[in-house]
Swiss-Prot record:
Its cofactor is Zn(2+). This is Queuine tRNA-ribosyltransferase. Homodimer. Within each dimer, one monomer is responsible for RNA recognition and catalysis, while the other monomer binds to the replacement base PreQ1. It comes from Synechococcus sp. (strain CC9605). Gene3D superfamilies: Queuine tRNA-ribosyltransferase-like. The active site is at D92, D265.
């Protein structure tokens, strides 16, 4: 039901392209996954989302538990039917949101008690509860409940977070009984190399269908994130998919793929789109800028999305300046398409044997400016 086949390797880096098989179809890697936190990618219908080339979509356990509730989703036949998406799906455990968004009352080895920001009621979230919610939601991949330490954090605090994360993973494995759903573990460890290595080996020992690197993109310098990926990835099973959580910029994805990462997710493309910013040729353009007012050329002539094939820069500029909802939708569609295209281009470069030539300029030690 689940399998991962590596189709090609880069001879000069650790980059690889492969196919991750799920009950709802294959995911070609490396691949960017759009974020549909509340069973919707903001401002985009599932039909529009499918046309971006997206294959796997991420939703969030914490937010769906609060609204509408996993029982509503389960009654609809699961997350796929509830949102009308027929492709693969992944649910984050909600651990990051509990620690970053919730009003924490208590955290201990048992789990977390926090206050529901919607109605003020107390919620007791344990690894077992998070796993049960995800089984009810029914995504193809569920993530283990973990403790993501903030940045910066003391070494003792990160040690405690790692200890809990590993103990909670064991409890998630015990609680997880749904055979048509894969459970991924999450590596933590903050910016402490020895803790990252210990966490990677601990999580890898469970021999799960896949592994994620978490606790990045939480405020640490980019160089720290690069080092974490470089140090941790070789310790993860090479025959299983590796998922770098919360990363979606071109440079960071290229560097991560060069180090053997397969999957990514990030809210960046839709967040940028909602603020009038588009991704073109490796750059970010603010379409509110007056320079686009008289520009009647396509946004990106090389892009096949509806924003680029059906509209001009001047029209998109007009929509954004007029605060028309259509503008936000079109820009979000374009940005997702760009990130999916970028990961697809990396996969093709790996197959063609030119990944290191085409994407090496993204490496932090290279001064070259890369456009694609």
């Amino acid at each position: 039901m689940f399998g991962f086949e590596i189709n090609a390797h880069c001879a000069n880096t650790s980059a690889r392209c492969g196919t991750f098989e799920t009950p709802h179809g294959p995911v070609n890697t490396p691949r960017f996954m759009p974020v549909g936190t509340l069973a919707t990618v903001k401002g985009i219908s599932t039909e529009q989302l499918g046309r971006t080339g997206a294959q796997m979509v991420l939703s969030n356990t914490y937010h769906l538990h609060l609204q509408p509730g996993e029982e509503i989703v389960a009654a609809a036949g699961g997350l796929h039917r509830f949102m009308g998406w027929n492709g693969p799906m992944l649910t984050d455990s909600g651990g990051f949101q509990v620690f970053s968004l919730g009003d924490l009352n208590k955290i201990d080895d048992r789990g977390v008690v926090f206050r529901n920001p919607r109605d003020g009621r107390t919620i007791d979230m344990t690894p077992e509860h998070a796993t049960q919610i995800q089984m009810a939601l029914g995504a193809d991949v569920a993530m283990a409940f973990d403790q993501c330490p903030p940045y910066p954090a003391t070494e003792n605090d990160v040690i405690d977070a790692c200890r809990r994360t590993h103990a909670w993973l064991e409890r998630c494995v015990t609680a997880h009984t749904r055979e048509d759903q894969a459970l991924f573990g999450i590596v933590q460890g903050g910016c402490f190399p020895h803790l990252r290595r210990e966490s990677a080996m601990a999580v890898a020992s469970f021999d799960l269908p896949g592994t994620a690197v978490g606790g990045v993109s939480v405020g640490e310098p980019a160089e720290e994130m690069h080092r974490i990926v470089r140090d941790v990835t070789p310790l993860l099973p090479s025959h299983k998919p590796r998922y770098l959580m919360g990363i979606g910029t071109l440079r960071e994805m290229a560097i991560a793929v060069a180090n053997g990462i397969d999957l990514f997710d990030c809210v960046l493309p839709t967040r940028l789109g909602r603020h009038g910013t588009v991704l073109v040729g490796g750059e970010r353009w603010n379409l509110r800028n007056a320079r686009f007012r008289h520009d009647h050329t396509p946004l990106d002539p090389s892009c096949s999305c509806v924003a680029c094939t059906g509209h001009t820069r001047a029209y998109l500029h007009h929509l954004i300046r007029s605060e028309e909802l259509l503008g936000l939708t079109l820009l979000s569609i374009h940005n997702i398409t760009q990130l999916v295209r970028f990961t697809s281009a990396m996969a093709q470069a790996i197959r063609d044997g030119c990944f290191s030539e085409d994407f090496a300029p993204w490496e932090p030690d290279s001064p070259a400016h890369h456009t694609w």
